[in-house]
Amino acid sequence: MKLETSIYDKLPATTKSGNVVIHKVYQRKGVEYARSIGGAFTLRVRDMDKHFGNPYSHVRALCEKDNLILTATTKDAVIMFIHYVLRSMDSRAVWIRSVLDSKVLVGKPLVYYSELGEPSHANALDYLINNWDEVKSKV
């Protein structure tokens, strides 16, 4: 987890930063909004296999409702998201890596639902998108 933690340490102090934009929208409406601004939606979307949502959360009720993996903190959830993207053989993680390889999202807006006052997995995704070749060489 050394690489994952070092990536987390490079993330901005707030959620709204870089290419991450805040817009309170959810599910397929979020996907539609992100497409309308030429970007990507970063949250989980029900009934979609391919999305950029984080399978980890520090919110117990959300984990129980959406079958997520519980972490102690938001920071832990973000680090675990980085780990998931870099190392998991889950089909969605493999798909995310293929999107990163394509570079189609470099410099594009990434829609997240709220300012957390700390980095979110959307910030981690932004970092991975825009530094993928360097990161990939270290995995």
Regions found by a protein language model. Name each.
Residues 1-139:
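Catalytic phosphate/metal-binding cores of nucleic-acid and nucleotide-processing enzymes, i.e., regions
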